[in-house]
Amino acid sequence: KPNNSLTYSKKNNINLKLHFFEPSEKKSKSTLLLFHGGAWAFGSSYSLFKICRDVSNQGITCISADYRIALKHNTKVKDSMDDARAAYQWIISNAKVLNIDPENIIVGGGSSGGQLAASLAMIPDENNKIIEKIKGLVLLNPALNTSVLDREIPDNIEERRKNLWLLVKKLFDGNFEQFSPSNYIREGLPPSIIFHGKSDKTIPIEIIEKFSNDMIEKGNMV
């Protein structure tokens, strides 16, 4: 269980919380903020509780974030991205009270949560503002190239994956290019570590390899 759960946003009677796992002895100034996976449609912040506890046992504060998801809140990808940004900004605004160093926040996530994390560091908001303070990215089988979701769905994939692909396509509202971190690679991005399986059928390893190579070409550390 987390040491503390605090509401960072209330939308349409939905309480979105940040779940804090505090180390008994803080050995690092860093804080790790994580977003769960689930195709922007399902999943739960609870799924990261064990990872967060393991991280906190190493002396680092770890936070698992709620955000709105399609099958529970009837939302789209843009809403999930807005929540991720709101969660980060809330931590920054309350850093002093939370005893968090705002200059040492690492952001991470798995699958769709990896897209949310990378988006925070890479994609500008509606006012063309970019978050430049993020210390690093920790990405687990991340959805870094969402442009590929706009392809025609192959006939030979299993029904369950086909249905999920159709659902995700609807959630993007056509913004496959705009919401794809791979389209925002530039110099000066945070150092990143990416964990990805070579046999991943949902996100082929080639996508991750291209992203990594493109990042390195721009002088970023991956």
Language-model features, listed with the residues they occupy:
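Alpha/beta-hydrolase superfamily serine-hydrolase fold, recognizing
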Residues: 1-222
